[in-house]
Amino acid sequence: MRRRLALSILALAAGAAHAAPDDIVGPAFRHPAEGALVLLLLEKSTEPHLVPGDKLMLAQLKSQLVIAGYRTAVLDYADYQLLEADEAAGGGERDPDGRLVVGLLARQRALAKLARIAAESSHCALVIRTRFVIRPAPVVDNFFAQWDGARRALKLTDTAPRANPDGPGRTVVGALRGLGSGLSIELMAYDGDGALAFTTHGAVAVPYVTRLGEGRVEWRDDLFFGDGDVADGMRIALAPMR
């Protein structure tokens, strides 16, 4: 009860969260007992602009689980990659150039196998893999994007030269519509029997600044100046643990 209350309070602090439509909670998933060991697996970002957020993401996953009453330890991602490569080779997935392709099924099988192996040696309740993903984010109310349980502000600027006092770089007041992109945390968890516990997502931020005057979009340079957005995204993604 105490651990669920702790996560519920964290969720209220982040605002109301609604699960993404493609989130999955396994039919056999049950909350681990208080004090259970949860093993964590960080998939490091390959996009340079996201790399600074990896440590923040892992730190938030650890701290929020500890607050909820669980013990945590971090697994070596290289061990998972070996299993992943084996599963991909067994599946025979290859690109047009003949190179091995690591698809979703290979990732799932590798994580399930890792969870079974880890449970035999550590008696862990879950293995949770965390990573950043870019997700579709519909624009709402002109200045916001809404996806994966949260609404986040768009960052819009107009850098075109102007004669008025506002000048270049002023914030544009205008209407945007359509589908944008949002940065989310993805959690994929398997229990000690190798069964899927859950796959969830939590919105972090709109990772791009739209420079309307120049007609281009680029990565924000202030994406990880603090960990507040990462913390909120993790609270949303950890909803099945409440």
Each language-model region and where it sits:
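Bacterial N-terminal signal peptides
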Residues: A6-G15
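Positively charged n-region of N-terminal signal peptides that target proteins for export
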Residues: M1-R4
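C-terminal/domain-edge helix-coil "capping" segments
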Residues: A19-A36, P136-P138, N142-R242
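Amphipathic, alpha-helical segments enriched in basic
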Residues: L40, E93, V102-R107, R162, ...
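N-terminal start-of-chain detector that recognizes signal peptides
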Residues: A11, G98-V102, L156-R162
